[in-house]
């Protein structure tokens, strides 16, 4: 054999498992190289671990071409390479422009170059494939076995038992659910034969055999290269290796097993192993032999395995997020020892964890629960949302789509939009857009995904929003303010404004800071708000109680402090603020012995700084000593002032009074009433004869406080609104009564 390559060739190919979790695909694979040398013209001895490695690599299941294993070999210039598993070991095929090189690997690790060997050529084999503990479950190998029970001729017709026609015809029909069927392989009496159309259920010039109902048609001339003859009793084994895409794969999870008592897609009275559209599988653990393995795999991130009996609570063996697969191995016949190998996602990779010595004794069932429901080969990762303001084209969502095919691998770049459902990026709504992808075999998968065109911008409320400062005795008109506002929106029109919160109205007479918030809500649920702050403050000054006018004799020498003592200041918020009263202006002091009219202005202030001014008019008259006239309607006589009614009327400027009535007693302390008519108007006057300890000017009564020394005499202003002295300075008249 001519040496074409002298250096080691490492395979750069890899097989991607048909399994995606959260938009990721993974190839849980390993690579190993074996070197050997041909010592003679027909056989060599390989690395002893090669056979066991290949068994682990293919996980020991099924026969036929191992499509999920890639092979590379030095010294050969070849186009394709593939690995087959047969009944006794493995075959390696390398096709080139000059022919096919075939190696055989038996269970002892021997490698035999079956054609064109050259002694002392050194070869290296590099295998890349699935790890021994983890296997792609999204393909199947279906074995059909039958025996010839009669045969008419070497070229002709035989009959079969059992009749495999139904199974084979279904497998070879285009409408069958399987996505890709690798050409079947035929074993006759444990000898393998291969032809692209090895088996057919209709006429074909290439078929080795035809199955027509129970009839077997054998084309011996097509077996000539194998020097095969056939007869009654010959045993046939036909193996189909079938790949599935997600759209045609089982809806939930898949299960593989080498347990002879458990069959894929079948259910018996004693055990069930379902790998079609069922979310729950129940396995009778008593029907599993020691050494049997069951591998459970799901295209979803989660599923659970539990065990239990009737009457016993279910106990979970496996319940973990991001589980990709579980492998179970039975180690003891009494069910006391099982091994579970968990494969799960961690930091973007699949890792494994082994749990040993799981005891399933006294438990009659293993319950496998696949969660999540059916998911197609074509999938999308997130809710697809477009902002109506950005005018997003549908093509921008293609990176959100993921498509995987059993043969082609990642075909996400081939996804196209097949129906846009009238998608309009400037119109809010939900559009059910159809996306499709077609693999290299011409098969198409589709998915309808909702694309949401949304408005995410809040309305804007326009208007005055500065802080309002208002006194508690005033009212801010909320309605007028709301009516003055306008609203604008990026998409909708005709939005209304409503009050969302109003803490002011119910507290408008209480000092404090309050807020009024209005809102506008558009049909997309976006909310725009505007808040105005209302500060209710104290804008009202105190109210003075007490005297307004005083008439006094020049002999009394009245002082400002005496007048101040007759005043009080009450604030609606702060209450009694009398202590805040001060003299603001004074033209009386120093003139109390001089006849004239003077004014003293007092000022009171509350805690808010509001000021109130109060003027007391003081008239100094040249009359008999011993009296004061307060507010024109209260005469206060000092001890020893023995004035008569006539004198009192004179100092009241009412000497012309008529209809005089009084209970006044001269020099006797007490309070008396005086009534009279002056120029047709009635008047009431209080006369107080003071005792030695009485105040000259009474202290005003403070609401809520007791003041027995005053008797509210100054309140008798009621009914005296017309007296001439009320608004003018009091002077003494000497006009005689008519």
From Swiss-Prot:
Its main location: membrane. Residues 1-27 form the signal peptide. It is found in: Membrane. It comes from the Viruses. Keywords: Membrane, Signal, Transmembrane, Transmembrane helix. GO terms for cellular component: membrane. It is a multi-pass membrane protein. The keyword Membrane applies. The chain crosses the membrane at residues 612-632, 712-732. This is Uncharacterized 81.3 kDa protein. It comes from Acholeplasma phage L2 (Bacteriophage L2).
